[in-house]
A protein has these predicted regions:
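Donor-sugar nucleotide-binding helix/loop cap in glycosyltransferases
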Residues: 1-331
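C-terminal, charge/polar-rich interaction regions
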Residues: 548-577, 639-644, 648-653, 658-660
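Basic/aromatic-rich interaction segments and small domains that mediate binding to polyanionic partners
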Residues: 587-622, 627, 635, 643-670
């Protein structure tokens, strides 16, 4: 009988990121839909709730059937967080639990407050044998089957690595009804033939077409489902990325060996459901296995000369041993993150490419068949924080550790799990003589100011009080709303004791930041001092420009400074006339201190040669200043140029030419 291929799905293509499940499940757990997720009205209602809470984006009411809710329900049930539906042939629903009600394991999942705890929940769920074999009588665990394949590969080749195309053709298309050795034979044959193929893409396409002859759905599914399946399998914590494929996590090798299984279970599915909903046991629940895993981890850390100390922890029970192991895993993760941070200066081009994807609205960039980057459209907020964190690491010279800079969580592949929570800034970069607090948002509408204006200023204010050094704020978004720029242009904040602060916050588009970031690396001059100089220059005219002009000025400064870096041009050394704020105090070597009360401007369209405008408090409402600081726009007279300022000294009122009087060295701003 010919082979009939059936691709198993540990996840769902409508919910490609398992890291979002806990957030959605938390919304569900506090809703009126607990125990009521079936039926059109409930599905539509829960979908609307997910949309309202920002968990999904049901653009323009695109989904009117409630399919979003069904996809989330499927993932809740498949992982044992709610009671799944029991078919009549398999038993009675009441023997398991009320349909769609939260299970004891679901409660444990809600209480998982670390990423390691979340991973363990998924690992317990994926270890359950609940996927039917073609005979309809046996059930298997895709994770355990795949681990068996990878361990056999390691036995033969020395590495458990499984590439994307290998997983696509011989990973999720097989199960324990196949012979393990034959599957690995096919993988190694594919690997050998592909290694000598001159055109990898054409080779892969041909192999997919050949394997697809025994598959009755779209052949695109081989690769499309691969990416989703591998992402779900990685959240178990036992597997991690290797290129676009998978490899067993070195510190979890013993656990992988204990979990691997080449046979299927013949027990009734309702028994597997009971196991699933109560929290399936893991090998690490056994003292001996837990101790073996801990000993192996300590050996690996000693081999890498990583210091650790767990002498203060009891090691009598499996739970205590696992607590000690998690402490060491955290130390190891921090050490790996420091190494990752050191390498970011060599990854600036990839960082640039990620920024480009975010600016475009997400998507994928394929370098070659084995290397690609992707920004999922529904994860752009997390990826924006993440890529700016990587940019900061690439610029380097920080005195705080990389894991102290960020507020968001990372997975074992250093990819973002979710955006940072509220209550603090996004990225805290502390340098020797100053600190930069970076805040980011994907919001682009006029709501941007309402959402970000207050928290960003509060976070920068808190940082000013915390650090005994200058603090600069960078607000980065794909688009900067003018109302947001206006809030940061003033930058006023009052502390709890009513102390007034004028905060230094510069709004930059992601494209502007990207331009300057790339220029620094192309010029081989990546340095936080240059970033500070950009911020200082951008904010230099905020006091005299209206927000539209200030945004334009920022764009001009970024372009000018980027060009100078790329062309290796030094900054101008000649004196530049200062920008004169309304009511400014100036000092003249002859007349002493004086105050600006008016300005003189030339408007070609006006009958008068010169027009005097009051300038003690601000420009008149009918006049605005352009980004260059010297050009004015008058509602009636059109465009004009500042040619002088009227200054009141103690015994004299003088009209001083601009810019000449302000660059000859006898007159200074006070």
């Amino acid at each position: 009988m010919s082979e009939h291929i059936d691709i198993w799905l540990v996840g769902n293509t409508g919910l490609r990121n398992p890291n979002r499940i806990q957030e959605g499940f938390s919304v569900f757990a506090s809703s009126s839909f607990v125990g009521k997720l079936h039926g059109r009205e409930n599905e539509l209602g829960f979908m609307r709730l997910l949309d309202e809470k920002g968990i999904i984006q049901n653009e323009d009411g695109k989904d009117v059937s409630g399919s979003h809710a069904r996809k989330w329900r499927l993932m809740f049930a498949k992982n044992g967080f709610i009671y799944p539906q029991v078919k009549k042939k398999d038993g009675q629903q009441e023997d398991l639990g009320r349909l769609d009600d939260i299970t004891p394991f679901g409660r444990a999942f809600l209480n998982a407050d670390t990423y390691a705890a979340v991973q363990e929940c998924f690992l317990r769920a994926m270890s359950v044998e609940q996927f039917p074999l073609p005979d309809g009588e046996h059930y298997f665990s895709p994770l355990r089957w795949l681990l068996a394949i990878m361990l056999e590969l390691e036995k033969r080749t020395g590495s458990s690595e499984l590439s994307r195309i290998e997983f696509a053709l011989w990973g999720h298309t097989t199960n324990p009804s196949y012979d393990l050795e034959s599957v690995v034979d096919n993988i190694l044959d594919l690997r050998q033939r592909r290694a000598v193929a001159p055109a990898k893409r054409a080779f892969d396409k041909k192999e997919i077409a050949k394997r697809g002859e025994n598959y009755d759905k779209k052949s695109d599914n081989f690769l499309d489902y691969s990416d989703m399946n591998m992402r779900y399998l990685r959240i178990s914590g036992v597997l991690q990325r290797k290129g676009r494929g998978l490899i067993i996590v070195p510190t979890k090798h013993i656990l992988a060996e204990k979990l691997a299984k080449v046979t299927a279970s013949k027990g009734p599915i309702i028994e597997q459901y009971r196991l699933l909903c109560s929290g399936a046991p893991l090998p690490t629940d056994n003292v001996d296995v837990a101790k073996a895993l801990l000993d192996d981890l300590m050996k690996q850390m000693k081999d890498r000369h990583i210091l650790f100390d767990i002498t203060d922890l009891p090691l009598d029970t499996a739970a205590e041993i696992n607590i000690a192991r998690r402490r060491l895993e955290n130390t190891l993760a921090q050490t790996d993150e420091i190494q990752y941070a050191k390498d970011q200066c060599n990854q600036w081009q990839e960082i640039r490419d990620y920024m480009s994807l975010i600016i475009k609205g997400g998507g994928k960039l394929v370098y070659d068949e084995d290397n690609a980057i992707e920004v999922p459209k529904d994860e752009m907020p997390a990826y924006l924080e993440w890529i700016l964190w990587r940019a900061a690491l690439a610029i380097d010279h920080m005195v705080n550790e990389p894991y102290e800079v960020r507020g968001f969580k990372l997975d074992s592949d250093f990819l973002p799990v979710s955006a940072a929570g509220g209550g603090k800034g996004d990225l805290y970069c502390e340098f020797e003589d100053f600190a930069i607090l970076t805040e980011v948002t994907m919001s682009t509408s006029s709501r941007q100011e309402a959402m970000e204006g207050e928290p960003v200023r509060r976070h920068v204010s808190d940082a000013v009080l915390k650090y005994d050094k200058p603090v600069y704020g960078m607000f980065i978004a794909v688009h900067i709303d003018t109302n947001t720029a206006e809030t940061f242009r003033h930058g006023i904040w009052y502390t709890k004791d009513d102390k007034k602060q004028r905060l230094d916050i510069v709004p930059l588009t992601l494209a502007q930041f990207q331009k300057y970031f790339v220029a620094m690396f192309e010029a081989n001059k990546a340095d936080p001092i240059l970033l500070r100089s950009l911020i200082v220059k951008c904010e230099s005219r905020r006091g005299i420009l209206e927000s539209p002009a200030w945004k334009q000025y920022i764009d001009e400064v970024v372009a000018e400074k980027s060009q100078k870096l790329v062309n290796r041009l030094p900054d101008q050394k000649h004196r530049i006339a200062p920008l004169i704020p309304a009511g400014a105090i100036v000092n003249d070597v002859c007349w002493g201190n004086g105050q600006v009360v008016a300005l003189i401007a030339n408007f070609p369209e006006c009958n008068k040669t010169c027009v005097e405008l009051p300038y003690l408090m601000s420009l008149p409402d009918e006049v605005s200043r352009c980004a260059d600081g010297q050009t004015l726009l008058h509602d009636r007279f059109g465009e004009g140029t500042i040619s002088g300022y009227v200054v009141v000294f103690k015994n004299k009122i003088l009209t001083l030419n601009y810019p000449d009087s302000f660059i000859k060295g006898t007159l200074n701003m006070v």
